[in-house]
Amino acid sequence: MNVNDLRNKTKAELKKELLELLKEQFNLRMQKGGGEAPRPHLFKRVRRDIARVKTLLGEKERNNE
């Protein structure tokens, strides 16, 4: 996920993206708990993408955008 692409999105789009990422993270955890072995690198990627989106949402809140 590219930060520059995320910066061009509105707050509503970022919130939608965050919700999708949280669902993806939940599904990965369920797969791991269910015995399936998902690719471990996906946990790190999704966690960092969530952090990026939350950071940009905070920036937009502070700038009243």
Swiss-Prot record:
One of its GO terms (cellular component) is cytosolic large ribosomal subunit. It comes from the Bacteria. One of its GO terms (biological process) is translation. InterPro entries: Ribosomal_protein_uL29 (IPR050063), Ribosomal_uL29 (IPR001854), Ribosomal_uL29_sf (IPR036049). Keywords: Ribonucleoprotein, Ribosomal protein. GO terms for molecular function: structural constituent of ribosome. It holds the Pfam family Ribosomal_L29. HAMAP family: Ribosomal_uL29 (MF_00374). Belongs to the universal ribosomal protein uL29 family. This is Large ribosomal subunit protein uL29. It comes from Coxiella burnetii (strain RSA 493 / Nine Mile phase I).
